[in-house]
């Protein structure tokens, strides 16, 4: 064991923030957060588990049946053995098959449009590097949208002219100063603020702590009493609608506003368009059904008196509606955020200090004021003379693309066709955990001629590949990042902590070598003649130039890199007074939105003209395929929420699992009434099933969930036992969820649309194997 005197700390970062990692240069001993926030983030303690995990991919591996006959492989992906090969053998095999498929079927046959959360650095983003290589080789099929916000990304540009989900919010200082009421609607920031797309600046939870102590009226609207509600304790009211009925609840509130003359007609006339069409629906003039509080109560399970009370509270106070993303990850998900904007517009508080709505307070610390900052540039998926994506598919429709090559589909007003995908390369992502209906995915995954996975760990995706390449973790290479997707609060060196484990290589180096195989001089073309540190210096020097325009001076790169310290950017007083939509609301003609009318569109003629029955021209209540209202006897709604101690599937294998696993499986939260009906006790192993599959989970009995709803957090690694009817032993919720698009408009993920049965498990003991590498690896 290393002498403690030889240990030192290295500054680096991950999606969960800057960290100090204790090492002796070969072994990681511990890790902790580098920012003094007073709020513990469990994810920051897991670096040792990431680097030294037994589930690391150690060597290049090829599926046995594929290696024997690449053009006519035998065996089944996910069931075949793996054979260790050298790096040269693996890269030669990839190059040969890539060349064959591209020449035979064209660039659209190659899906390299994956994305994922492996690294937050500006250089070593695996998906970007993959796309850069494929651009050099002549193009590929890319992706549209993402799994997190596919529906919202599609609808919000029509409604307010931008995505909103990835944009800065009205500043937290103004919320704390001016808001009277703050509503968390389908948002659990105590969990989701642990991460960011870059590195977390870790300020959001401090603001929520201040909110807890502010004396304001705080309301959470969610089928589950989340960790955030527990954090606020008796200072927050929990309102629990039936899952998937948020639009009905909002319509009931909106009707109450009109019924009492509380809607702001002047704001609606000046800053919106289409309200009259929506009002005709709201009041029942167009369909004969007035969307009263009583009507809404029958659907959403919240009493009519409470609905009227919410309307009065929202009207009588400066109200900030902080909406999360879970409710738009449902069938007809576009309606949820469209309706919350409509409700905020009816209140007339958009563009005011502390009022309106926000769709990103729960992610990446939205509302933390943007600093005067020297912002890094980053590696691009394009390169000079290359060919970018020749086609793109909605990322959540990859399975349908594989099942139906050439098939017609509609997307965002366009008639499109799925490409004929023959080759998939997934780098830096975990599609087997984030895609719905796992068994359908596994069947479709057999169709391509070649599947390559670049991975640090033996995930389910890696186990279902033909070729698996061992990748470095972020702690085995050098990189740079910013903290705060919106604040740009810090510039952080992500310094290499330990050498690469086993035969792991940087994706940057792998794709550079493949580029040289593709064409003479390809290595130099891919790298542009720069090494890892030279690229980092280039990105840093761009930040220095940008900083100079903001009166922010950075030291020379060599000095910065040697210092092993982050740089905090200066505060910007203007950002601390930032109000989203303030300029527009003050003068809509001078500052129009980027919508068709220049105003907030409560009714969109463009969307109406598309004629989509699943996304009409204004927000509406549409009944999902699977919900409480059409459940069969004893079926329960399945809520797939963000986990507390993982980033989606990342760290599922780590020691953090000891903090949440029940019966050595993913926990499922069950209301006592539902548990009692089924003879289930706390800690029991239970079976959940529907027509799509079955899983085992560990029972957690809690009053903190709506009766008729069960919650299983997304991200557990699939662990299907083919000797036991394919039951997932680890509790991967997407075995149960329905793979259907949110609508023709967005084609977003609808992972919160599922019903399942539940019972106490009385079958044979099934050993967990999710985190075991293949026998030959």
Curated annotation (Swiss-Prot):
Q: Write down how the cofactor binds this protein.
A: Binds 1 molybdenum-bis(molybdopterin guanine dinucleotide) (Mo-bis-MGD) cofactor per subunit.
Q: Any domain commentary?
A: The N-terminal 39 residues are essential for activity.
Q: Report the protein's function.
A: This enzyme may serve as a scavenger, allowing the cell to utilize biotin sulfoxide as a biotin source. It reduces a spontaneous oxidation product of biotin, D-biotin D-sulfoxide (BSO or BDS), back to biotin. Also exhibits methionine-(S)-sulfoxide (Met-S-SO) reductase activity, acting specifically on the (S) enantiomer in the free, but not the protein-bound form. It thus plays a role in assimilation of oxidized methionines.
Q: Which UniProt keywords apply?
A: Metal-binding, Molybdenum, Oxidoreductase
Summarize where Mo-bis(molybdopterin guanine dinucleotide) binds, as residue positions. 148
Name the species this protein comes from.
Escherichia coli (strain K12)
Q: What is this protein called?
A: Biotin sulfoxide reductase
Cofactor(s) essential for the protein: Mo-bis(molybdopterin guanine dinucleotide)
Query: Do you know which InterPro entries this protein is assigned to?
Result: Asp_de-COase-like_dom_sf (IPR009010), BisC (IPR006658), CT_DMSOR/BSOR/TMAOR (IPR041954), MoPterin_dinucl-bd_dom (IPR006657), Mopterin_OxRdtase (IPR006656), Mopterin_OxRdtase_prok_CS (IPR006655), Prok_Mopterin_Oxidored (IPR050612)
